[in-house]
């Protein structure tokens, strides 16, 4: 009796095991169907994304909010050998989720945002996590490779910019040469009847005239800038200050002296004469603090050096036997301190 009961229980157990196997096989086939549904073969990352996406997007809205992104990324670990991201990546994703919590993301936007925050694509991250490699080291290598690529791109951009500048300078040089040849051709075309030597000489003269005209035009512009001091201020509605007036008068005086060198020389000579007279009077002038005795009064002809010298010369010449009296002697002694 008990043997029949045991056989019945064993038969029921086998039926339950077979039913469980059938259900498991059906679920597995359904999962494979989801992975292969759509256009062609689906990648491993896309298949896992579809599974975890349905769990987060329970309302089937077709998008998730940014605040749900950490949960979505964490669910990838159920299908991989280890977590999809490192701790630094999780912090970056959490910061993005807290900064824009209600930002809507569809699957494509999620992939691009994931690549921006993590530094690698979702497919690459899934492959690395599925193989069980040390993730921080691999992701660091990926970031270093990305940084190296950015540095190379920056160097390439700088090199291209320098090359572009060099080409522009060369283009300007060729443009100036072309303009010169064009002027030469037009000149020869208009003077083809003349001889070769005379035509060349005329072309050189015309180029010199053109250069002189350009220099004259530049000098005229500078002259107008120098002469238009107060006029420019008046046109601008500004009142000229004393410093501006002084600078304007100084420029005008300098231009006048440059145009009239003789007048400048005479003015300089006159200024020197006035300075010498004033300084000489200041040096040789009498000191009012020192009282000097008044000199004896002399005749007017003795006050003139030339007339006095002539008088005494004639006197000594024509009156050699003139008698020297006591008065003359006393005057001589007092004069020379004898």
Curated annotation (Swiss-Prot):
Transmembrane segments: 263-283
Pfam families cross-referenced by the UniProt entry: MPS2
Parts forming coiled coils: 149-228
InterPro entries (alphabetical): Mps2
GO cellular component: cytoplasm; nuclear membrane; spindle pole body
Keyword Nuclease found: no
UniProt subcellular location: Nucleus membrane; Cytoplasm, Cytoskeleton, Microtubule organizing center, Spindle pole body
Superkingdom, natural source: Eukaryota
Keyword Transmembrane helix: yes
GO biological process, one term: spindle pole body duplication
Membrane topology recorded in Swiss-Prot or TrEMBL: Single-pass membrane protein
Keywords attached to this entry: Coiled coil, Cytoplasm, Cytoskeleton, Membrane, Nucleus, Transmembrane, Transmembrane helix
Described function: Component of the spindle pole body (SPB) required for insertion of the nascent SPB into the nuclear envelope and for the proper execution of spindle pole body (SPB) duplication.
Entry's family note: Belongs to the MPS2 family.
Protein name: Monopolar spindle protein 2
The organism of origin for this protein: Eremothecium gossypii (strain ATCC 10895 / CBS 109.51 / FGSC 9923 / NRRL Y-1056) (Yeast)
